[in-house]
């Protein structure tokens, strides 16, 4: 089974959590694209989706799935999204696709976070994948210096502007043993919109596409 086939298996497995008449929180990325394609088969049963990015909104609308703004809903039953890394505590690094802030908002208004990944994304310690930080442009140099103090090697992601009009700094060479504490420290820096650590609000369900099929884990 190829990596993309494992992503597809995880994406389709998340359909089990979609309930009739609901509005579904939808993340961003290659694995989520498979979930969106799967969701099309249930589009007559659901009211629609809240999307975490322009890219996902375009894919949903192309398939005829109504998209609501986050401000139009009081809450969501589920949020389905991928991860760049996830550890045994269900803490995640997300934001490789630069949609981390909107992903964090949609996750926050959802009762259950369902993380869909292939088995290469499971790690013992977070940080091998560069940690994305969304930053207001005028704070770029200051935040870079502060991230060095926290033990990282920051790199400006050239040519990338988030859906919110901000920039991304990727932090390399961080072994993150206390994800909640690091999330709090980076989020407290003036000029940071949010960091791509999802630990304060981690995943509740993990669906892992693997060569032998989909492995399911729940908190």
UniProtKB/Swiss-Prot annotation:
User: What GO terms fall under cellular component here?
Assistant: cytosol
Q: Catalysed reaction(s)?
A: aldehydo-D-ribose 5-phosphate = D-ribulose 5-phosphate
Molecular function (GO) terms listed?
ribose-5-phosphate isomerase activity
- The top EC class, named as a word, is isomerase
Q: Which residues are involved in binding substrate? A: 28-31, 81-84, 94-97, 121
Q: Which domain of life is it from?
A: Bacteria
BP term (GO), one: D-ribose metabolic process
Pathway involvement? Carbohydrate degradation; pentose phosphate pathway; D-ribose 5-phosphate from D-ribulose 5-phosphate (non-oxidative stage): step 1/1
UniProt entry keywords in alphabetical sequence: Isomerase
Q: Which InterPro entries match?
A: NagB/RpiA_transferase-like, Ribose5P_isomerase_typA_subgr, Ribose5P_isomerase_type_A
Entry's EC annotation: 5.3.1.6
As for what it does, the entry says: Catalyzes the reversible conversion of ribose-5-phosphate to ribulose 5-phosphate.
The identity of this protein, by name, is Ribose-5-phosphate isomerase A
Organism of origin is: Photobacterium profundum (strain SS9)
The gene from which this protein is expressed is rpiA
């Amino acid at each position: 089974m190829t990596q993309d086939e494992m992503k597809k298996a995880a994406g389709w497995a998340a359909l089990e959590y979609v309930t009739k008449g609901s509005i579904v929180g939808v993340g961003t990325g290659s694995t989520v694209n498979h979930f969106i394609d799967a969701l099309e088969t249930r589009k007559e049963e659901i009211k629609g989706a809240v999307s975490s990015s322009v890219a996902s909104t375009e894919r949903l609308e192309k398939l005829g799935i109504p998209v609501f703004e986050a401000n139009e809903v009081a809450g969501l039953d589920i949020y389905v999204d991928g991860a760049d890394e996830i550890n045994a505590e269900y803490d995640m690094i997300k934001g490789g696709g630069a949609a981390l802030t909107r992903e964090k908002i949609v996750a926050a208004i959802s009762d259950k976070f369902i993380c869909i990944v292939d088995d290469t994304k499971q790690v013992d310690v977070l940080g091998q994948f560069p940690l994305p930080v969304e930053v207001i442009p005028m704070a770029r140099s200051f935040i870079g210096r502060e991230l060095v103090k926290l033990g990282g090697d920051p790199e400006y992601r050239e040519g990338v502007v988030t859906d919110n009009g901000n920039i991304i700094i990727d932090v390399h060479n961080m072994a993150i043993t206390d994800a909640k504490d690091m999330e709090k420290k980076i989020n407290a820096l003036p000029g940071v919109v949010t960091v791509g650590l999802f630990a304060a609000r981690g995943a509740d369900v993990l669906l892992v596409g693997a060569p032998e099929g989909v492995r399911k884990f729940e908190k």
